[in-house]
Amino acid sequence: MTEVLLEGLVIGESARWHDGRFWCANWGAQEVLAVDASGKREVMARVPTTIPFSIDWLPDGRLLVTSGPEGLLLRQESSGELVTHADLSSYGGLNELVVDGRGNAYVNGGCDFQPGPGERPGFILLVTPDGSVRRVADELAFPNGMVITPDNSTLVVAESFGGVLTAYDVADDGSLSNRRVWAPHPGDGMCMDASGAIWTPGWTPSGESACLRIAEGGDILDTVPLEHAGFACTLGNGTLHMLTADWHLDEPFDTNLDRLLTTPTGRILTHRTSTPKAGYP
């Protein structure tokens, strides 16, 4: 059974499980939230940007935040202050973020809502623990959520406009190679479970919003129906946490955003599941 944990978000994104609580970005409110099992929310950071922004953590526990329109990767210090971890503005706007078990931060971007015919402007950047930056993937059709396997050997990224989950091998130096289709399904903010399947918001074959558990190759293993569009999900404490909002696919981006800023419909939903989370984030 699916239950409502919290209502009143603008657009919840970047679902994470960290230190025994559910965390997310509350787009439109400039907030990073942590929410406990009773639905009590705490603002953990305020991000001076619009949208998008995404979150993850370095191995030492410091929070990283992508400030998308500004092209910055921010880091939260012990004082709570957000400082620049890496200036990536020369590459363009940023979207999603994942940090692997070695402290490598992968940041994607180039998410053009109206690319030219045949254009795939998306990219993935690697920010290593020593601060160096390099571009490790190109030609992505609106890169979105990413996951990395527990052994740090494979990265999977959702190409929302390409309608596929795309996988890469990860080398010891963090480079990506051997691009391939992991599953022929679109995705958004996603997570991996201990069986190697991926949970992601998506759509049923009949076009209804749902959170899907997908096996490598594309088989749908489980489906959790959703009333509104799903944006991201994660696993924690035996529970699938899902972020939804009343986004209308037939309306322009600005129309949706204006409506949701006026009447927030964002929710955190929960659904019990037996297979625990694995990998990163």
Describe these PLM feature segments.
Residues 6-19, 47-67, 89-112, 121-123, ...:
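Beta-rich, blade/repeat-based domains predominating
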Residues 1, 39-43, 79-84, 127-134, ...:
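Beta-strand initiation motifs
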Residues 23-46:
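Beta-propeller domains
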Residues 168, 176, 181-216:
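Loop/turn-rich, solvent-exposed surfaces of beta-rich toroidal or solenoidal domains
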Residues 232-281:
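Blade-level signature of beta-propeller repeat domains, shared across WD40, Kelch, NHL, RCC1
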Residues 31-33, 71-74, 122-125, 164-166, ...:
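A short loop-to-beta-strand structural motif that recurs across blades of beta-propeller domains
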Residues 35-36, 75-78, 128, 169, ...:
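Structural recognition of the beta-propeller blade-terminating site
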Residues 27-28, 68-69, 112-122, 160-163, ...:
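Short, solvent-exposed loop/turn segments at conserved positions within beta-propeller repeat blades
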